[in-house]
Each structure stands twice: as structure tokens, then as C-alpha cells.
């Protein structure tokens, strides 16, 4: 059979171009994970200096590292769920010698269990008082104990101050966001037990609750993030006690609300979601997923990318060897601030590996 040489050349050229394109696509979604700080010796570049007798967890602070926040210039603040503390680091993993205690409910013994943390940019909102001194909160925490606390350095450098205590009603706060509208400053706390997102004003006074009433039974607000003035809220499946999530393929939803709690749209249903919690909008220089909404699954540790306008799936992060990037116990996601928290195209993450018994702070960069 005669085969035209020109046709054969075009065929091979097509094969080469296609192969190169596929290689380019695969490499573009590969990301390098760097473990910066952990309580587990050898897991990260730095072992938690608060650990007094490694490998035991005695004195350790970075346990089940959860929420992550910072100002435009500050280092990274992490809510350490397993120790009731907040520890500070640079974006490169340098230890900042300040440890803040997040208080438990009134009259409770033991440490608190902080989850969400936000930075407040207001000079007069969210004031707390202790020992006759009043100041605005720079960082605000919520906890699985059903409390919300504010940290004001002029009030107490080493302790956040209890501002809201709903432990008596069984509240279990899993996430926290902050936002400013024409009506003022507000915080938004995900009550996983009740299934509502609770809004509080700048005086820590309850305003109202909201949720997605179209969800299947058993789903409750899990993660939350203010992105470009809109609230992105993830929903996870509750366990029988309505305290923890039930992980599994497709177990999750993601909605978008305005700052008044009005649902704007359902962005993602099921699919690659698996107890989603971490949320971050990628900058324009983050490899294949530049400009995409990144959603971290606590359930399987995957980080999936979606178009932020319509929720179309864009794939998930891969390791340099082509395998799926999975971070055990993945929680928070946040891009650096271009200052102490690291480059703006470096994705910082927190995690509670080994069934939330340990903690990890690290970073991800496009390869």
C-alpha cells in the first residue's frame, strides 16, 4: 500500500505536537510540597520548638493545625486545634516567638479547640476588655467549643479574650470569615452542629443566621472564606452527633452568599468534593490553576481547582512525579502576602495528619 510521504510527515508532526501538549498540561498542574513546621520529628524542616520531649507531644503547640490568617504584612497566624493555641511563623517556616492562648468556655477545664481565624483590619471594631483595659481585636478565633474570642495586643499579648460563649447551646464552630459592607464590619461563624452560619456585628452581637435550605438533610456549613466581597461556604456531611464530618467521595457542596447571607448561587455539588474546607483564589502566576478557585478536601487531602465564575472542574494538583498530591488531614489554604507570610504565589497550608493527632504547616509552589 502506498502512503504519501507528506501525509506521513504531517501525521508524525501531529503526534509530536499532541504529545508535547499533553506533557505541558501535565507538568503545568504539578506542584512541589514543602513541609515547614510539624510536631513530628523529621516530617518538616523545623520540629515544633514548643515540644519538650519529642517524639512525645508534651508541650507541643502545632497540633491539628487548622485555620490560617495574616494581615497584609504580618507573619502567618495558625489556629492550633489540638493545643488550644495560636502559633506564628514566616512564610518560609521561621518561628516567631509569640504563642497566644485561645480561651475555653467559661468555667471549662482543659484547652480550647480553635478552628477558624481571621484578621480584622478595623481600628475600632470587635473590641475586647480584660483587667480594665479595652482594645480592638487584631485576630479573631472561633472554636469547636462554641466560643468566639478576640486577640488585642494592648489588652493581653499572650491571651485572646472570650467574646461569645455559646457552649451551653451545643454550638460547634468549624470556620470563620470576616467582611465589611455599607452596614459595617461583621464576622461569620459556621455552626456545624446547628447547620447555620451565624452573623455577628462589630460588637460581637448576634445579628442573624443563614444557610442553604436546598441542601440534602445532614449537610452543614464547614469551611468559609470571604473572596472578593462574597462568602464562599463549603458544606460537609454531619456525623450522628453533628460534631464532626463524614468523609467520602462526593460528600460536599459549595455555595456563594453575599455579606447579608443571601444565597447567590450553588457553585459546586458533589463531584470531587470530599469534606471540603480550605478555600483560596489562585493568583495569575500559579501554574495551570492560575486564577482558579482552589478547594482543599479534608476527607482525602486533595486540592481541586474550579473556575470561580461557574464552578467548572479544572483538575487537581499533582506531585512532580505525576501522582496525585494528597495531604493527610488537610485544613487551611492561603496565598502569601508578599511580606512576612511569603510570596503571593506560594500556597500555604495547614493540616492535622494521623487522624488530627499531629500538626503540619507547609507550602506549595508551581513546578
Which residues are covered by each model-predicted region?
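Sequence/structural signature of beta-propeller domains
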Residues: 28-367
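Bacterial N-terminal signal peptides
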Residues: 12-23
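Short, flexible coil/linker elements and helix-boundary hinge sites characteristic
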Residues: 3, 21, 54-57
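N-terminal secretory signal peptides that target proteins for export/translocation
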Residues: 1-9
Amino acid at each position: 500500500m502506498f502512503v504519501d510521504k507528506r501525509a506521513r510527515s504531517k501525521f508524525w508532526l501531529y503526534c509530536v505536537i499532541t504529545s508535547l501538549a499533553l506533557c505541558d498540561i501535565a507538568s503545568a498542574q504539578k506542584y512541589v510540597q514543602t513541609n515547614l513546621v510539624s510536631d513530628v520529628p523529621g516530617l518538616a524542616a523545623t520540629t515544633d520548638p514548643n515540644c519538650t520531649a519529642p517524639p512525645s507531644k508534651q508541650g507541643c503547640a502545632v497540633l491539628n493545625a487548622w485555620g490560617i490568617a495574616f494581615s497584609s504584612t504580618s507573619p502567618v497566624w495558625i489556629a492550633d486545634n489540638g493545643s488550644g493555641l495560636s502559633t506564628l511563623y514566616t512564610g518560609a517556616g521561621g518561628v516567631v516567638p509569640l504563642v497566644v492562648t485561645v480561651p475555653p468556655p467559661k468555667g471549662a477545664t482543659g484547652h480550647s479547640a480553635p478552628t477558624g481565624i481571621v484578621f480584622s483590619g478595623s481600628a475600632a471594631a470587635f473590641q475586647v476588655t480584660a483587667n480594665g483595659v479595652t482594645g480592638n481585636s487584631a485576630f479573631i478565633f472561633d472554636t469547636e467549643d462554641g466560643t468566639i474570642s478576640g486577640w488585642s495586643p494592648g489588652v493581653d499579648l499572650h491571651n485572646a479574650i472570650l467574646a461569645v460563649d455559646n457552649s451551653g447551646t451545643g454550638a460547634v464552630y468549624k470556620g470563620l470569615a470576616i467582611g465589611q459592607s455599607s452596614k459595617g464590619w461583621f464576622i461569620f461563624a459556621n455552626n456545624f452542629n446547628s447547620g447555620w452560619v451565624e452573623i455577628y456585628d462589630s460588637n460581637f452581637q448576634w445579628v442573624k443566621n443563614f444557610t442553604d435550605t436546598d441542601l440534602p438533610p445532614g449537610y452543614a456549613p464547614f469551611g468559609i472564606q470571604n473572596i472578593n466581597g462574597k462568602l464562599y461556604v463549603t458544606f460537609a456531611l454531619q456525623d450522628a452527633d453533628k460534631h464532626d464530618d463524614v468523609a467520602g467521595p462526593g460528600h460536599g457542596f459549595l455555595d456563594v452568599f453575599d455579606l447579608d447571607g443571601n444565597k447567590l448561587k450553588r457553585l459546586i455539588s458533589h463531584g470531587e468534593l470530599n469534606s471540603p474546607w480550605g478555600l483560596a483564589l489562585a493568583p495569575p502566576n500559579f501554574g495551570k490553576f492560575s486564577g482558579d478557585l482552589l478547594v482543599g478536601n479534608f476527607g482525602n487531602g486533595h486540592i481541586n481547582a474550579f473556575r470561580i465564575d461557574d464552578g467548572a472542574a479544572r483538575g487537581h494538583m499533582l506531585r512532580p512525579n505525576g501522582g496525585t498530591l494528597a495531604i493527610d488531614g488537610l485544613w487551611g489554604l492561603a496565598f502569601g502576602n508578599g511580606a512576612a507570610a511569603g510570596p503571593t504565589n506560594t500556597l500555604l497550608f495547614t493540616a492535622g495528619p494521623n487522624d488530627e493527632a499531629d500538626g503540619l504547616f507547609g507550602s506549595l509552589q508551581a513546578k
